[in-house]
């Protein structure tokens, strides 16, 4: 067991086995029934009630805990109206009805209306243009179709990117409003039976959600970079960068169908067609729509519940575990299914303490508020405690909504080997093999190529994903450079109730994880990870998997630059040859793509040199760690590892730059970040990758040099940890 002596590993395994016997699905079910009983969005009475109930439980179990409050901007709807004004008239309902057999779907007085938070106020009328998913590539296709959205209201379907990208790109192209609807092709009847007969989105179901421009910064829009405490300096609303530039409203496919059916113009390309019984057309016109939204721009309180278990020997090294407790409505799946696992972990750890267990490091258990609106509670807490976290935070482990199926682990690749080791020790409740083995089998079974099947058989560790944004790890990894993991289960329970009134106990107990057995598995997995990190003599970071992953990222950006150069040259050649005009269908003409200048060759030597230094340092650390672990880990037992651990914690910090990424300084990590045009989706080596994607060649050269230096700095931090560790031998 990495980071342990032979003797301490045996003791740790015994304590972990005791812990894994404690989580009980009956407890998880009872917590879920309580927490999801009523709507509990930010500012609601039940949001506060839930926070106080969680606080009472963890105190009752014997943990030191408190609620930390922040005051954040949270707009709620004042007026919403959407109507088709030509060629016929239709008024959208903009309501989700009660469903028979689902008691909490009738709690309309407490439910937030269907809306997108952080849309600006607006009252606009214009022609309707269908933009598919509303991502940048769709606007390139519209340009070839000869369709402009300038002065139009666009309608985009949910999917392909985070929702906030859709109004952002629409505004960049001159649109005056944005509608976002859930097409049954993505999560409705095309996928299976709709709720309540099945798990998928009913015709009137609507996906609420934030459209805050989180790729700029998450958290309270008025206090970027600082905690939203009572005395904090706040921006004026007119100064906020993260509000949309045009009004936005989400709608159901029942409300979208009459609008789409009223459109004419060119038939939408085949990949743009959803599953409504209409002919999908692009427009513009003759459909004209009137959209009006206005909001109460109020400040609301957040209630973060923070519990601590003090470390016995290294109290100033923190292992932080978090899950949010707020929801858009009742939120049984998102987030309560994850929050109940964290509650059961807290109960289990408290039980072990009564049996005599004490962690070496401090464990901090966090139940965040305000995640749904823009990662508010976690971001404000992290910004408020930034200095202390930079000194003390070793690892952050996050979870969110949890379902049935396979382990999904993403995070810092310095922790890839560690979480693989944890996964080998957890039994899957259905397959009765380890969750690691079940995931390995799935990866072997799914790929089409022999090479892809071979890797999970031959590589020592299963690869974990990289983190972008979309949950409460963002402030820790993206802003502060704290090594992080995001854990959960899924893949066997599909559905279409996300951010609707139908995400409730009635749905989850039938279609989610009915017996809460994967809730138990999440508690076992995350709790074991927390214990193993908190109890290790030497923090179990590993740099072999990390450098292997960085090598892949470097290869990817080099190939991206080469491929883009070749594509631009080939496209220019085709334009000069008259190819597009010659093969165009006269009855369905497309404009040729714009001709572009061939990009310069990029010099990747600084990035390659930085990687080489990082790789050498990783090898040195592996050798030092192997020597320290030899002979049962006597070297670990016979000396203080405080400095070695401090230097290991500093490695992830070395992957950040204080001035952050281009045009978004809040995002300081140079290896992982949410994409500027993907939102939640990660971009690895983001400064380099996105400057290439956006064809900013001078910026790309600058970023290659900056990131190369960051890799060198990380290598120096790893070498320092290796030297400290070797000093005891």
Model-derived regions, located:
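Noncatalytic luminal/extracellular "stalk/propeptide" segments of secretory-pathway proteins
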Residues: 4-8, 14, 33-153, 184, ...
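Second-shell loop/turn segments in exported
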Residues: 14-22, 36-45, 114-119, 153-160, ...
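Structural recognition of the beta-strand scaffold that forms the well-ordered cores
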Residues: 31-34, 66-67, 128-131, 153-157, ...
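Metal-dependent peptidase/peptidase-like ectodomains
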Residues: 89-91, 202-267, 314, 370-509, ...
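Soluble metallo-hydrolase cores and metallopeptidase-like ectodomains found primarily
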Residues: 106-141, 216-333, 347, 351-355
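A conserved hydrophobic secondary-structure block that centers on an alpha-helix together
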Residues: 128-200, 312-318, 328, 343-344, ...
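Alpha-helical metal-binding/catalytic segments enriched in His/Glu/Asp
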Residues: 184, 305, 321-375, 380, ...
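C-terminal amphipathic alpha-helical interaction region
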Residues: 630-729
């Amino acid at each position: 067991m990495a980071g342990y002596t032979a003797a301490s590993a045996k003791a740790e395994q015994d304590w972990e086995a005791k812990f894994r016997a404690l989580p009980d699905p009956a407890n998880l079910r009872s917590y879920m029934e309580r927490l999801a009983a009523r709507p509990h969005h930010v500012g609601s009475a039940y949001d506060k009630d839930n926070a106080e109930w969680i606080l009472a439980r963890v105190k009752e179990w014997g943990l030191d805990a408190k609620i930390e409050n922040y005051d954040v901007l949270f707009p709620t709807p004042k007026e919403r109206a959407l109507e088709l004004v030509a060629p016929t008239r239709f008024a959208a309902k903009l309501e989700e009805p009660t469903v028979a057999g689902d008691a909490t779907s009738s709690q309309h007085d407490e439910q937030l209306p269907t809306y997108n938070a952080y849309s600006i106020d607006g009252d606009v009328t214009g022609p309707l243009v269908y933009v598919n998913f509303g991502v940048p590539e769709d606007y390139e296709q519209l340009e070839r179709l000869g369709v402009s959205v300038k002065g139009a209201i666009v309608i985009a379907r949910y999917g392909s990117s985070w929702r906030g990208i859709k109004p952002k790109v629409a505004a960049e192209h001159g649109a005056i409003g944005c509608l976002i609807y859930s097409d049954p092709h993505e999560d409705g009847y095309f996928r299976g039976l709709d709720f309540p007969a099945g798990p998928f989105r009913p015709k009137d179901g609507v996906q609420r959600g934030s459209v805050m421009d989180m790729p700029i910064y998450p958290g309270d829009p008025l206090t970027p970079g600082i905690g939203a405490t009572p005395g904090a300096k706040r921006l004026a609303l007119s100064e906020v960068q993260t509000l949309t530039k045009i009004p936005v409203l989400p709608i159901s496919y029942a409300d979208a169908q009459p609008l789409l059916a009223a459109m004419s113009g060119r038939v939408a390309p085949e990949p743009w067609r959803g599953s409504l019984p209409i002919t999908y057309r692009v427009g513009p016109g003759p459909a004209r729509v009137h959209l009006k939204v206005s909001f109460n721009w109020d400040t609301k309180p957040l209630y973060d519940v923070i519990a601590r278990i003090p470390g016995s020997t290294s109290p100033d090294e923190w292992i932080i575990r978090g899950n949010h407790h707020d929801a858009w409505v009742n939120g049984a799946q998102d987030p309560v299914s994850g929050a109940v696992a964290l509650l059961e972990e807290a109960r289990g750890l408290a039980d072990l303490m009564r049996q005599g267990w004490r962690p070496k490091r401090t464990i901090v258990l966090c139940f965040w508020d305000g995640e749904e609106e823009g990662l508010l509670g976690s971001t404000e807490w992290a910004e408020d405690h930034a200095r202390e976290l930079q000194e003390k935070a070793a690892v952050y482990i996050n979870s969110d909504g949890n379902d049935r199926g396979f382990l999904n682990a993403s995070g810092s690749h310095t922790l890839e080997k560690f979480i693989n080791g944890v996964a080998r020790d957890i039994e899957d409740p259905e397959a009765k093999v380890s969750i690691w083995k079940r995931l390995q089998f799935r990866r072997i079974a799914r790929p089409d190529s022999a090479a892809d099947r071979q890797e999970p058989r031959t590589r020592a560790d299963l690869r974990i994903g990289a983190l972008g944004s979309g949950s409460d790890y963002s402030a820790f990894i993206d802003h502060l450079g704290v090594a992080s993991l995001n854990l959960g289960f899924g893949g066997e329970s599909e559905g279409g109730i996300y951010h609707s009134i139908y995400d409730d106990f009635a749905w989850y107990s039938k279609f989610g994880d009915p017996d809460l057995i994967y809730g138990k598995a999440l508690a076992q997995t995350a709790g074991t990870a927390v214990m193993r990190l908190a109890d290790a003599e030497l923090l179990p970071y590993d740099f072999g998997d990390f450098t292997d992953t960085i090598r892949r990222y470097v290869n990817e950006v080099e190939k991206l630059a080469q491929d883009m150069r070749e594509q631009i040259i080939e496209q220019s050649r085709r334009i000069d040859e008259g190819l597009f005009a010659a093969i165009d269908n006269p009855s369905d003409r497309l404009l040729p793509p714009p001709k572009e200048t061939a990009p310069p060759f990029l010099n990747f030597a600084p990035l390659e040199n930085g990687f080489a230094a990082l790789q050498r340092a990783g090898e040195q650390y592996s050798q030092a760690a192997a020597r320290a672990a030899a002979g049962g880990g006597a070297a670990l037992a016979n000396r203080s590892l405080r400095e070695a651990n401090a230097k290991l914690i500093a490695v992830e910090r070395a992957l950040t730059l204080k001035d952050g990424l281009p045009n978004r300084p809040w995002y300081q990590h140079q290896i992982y970040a949410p994409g500027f045009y993907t939102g939640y989706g990660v971009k690895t080596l983001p400064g380099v990758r996105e400057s290439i994607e956006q064809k900013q060649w001078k910026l790309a050269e600058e970023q290659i040099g900056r990131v190369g230096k960051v890799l060198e700095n990380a290598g120096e931090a790893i070498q320092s940890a290796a030297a400290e560790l070797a000093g005891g031998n």
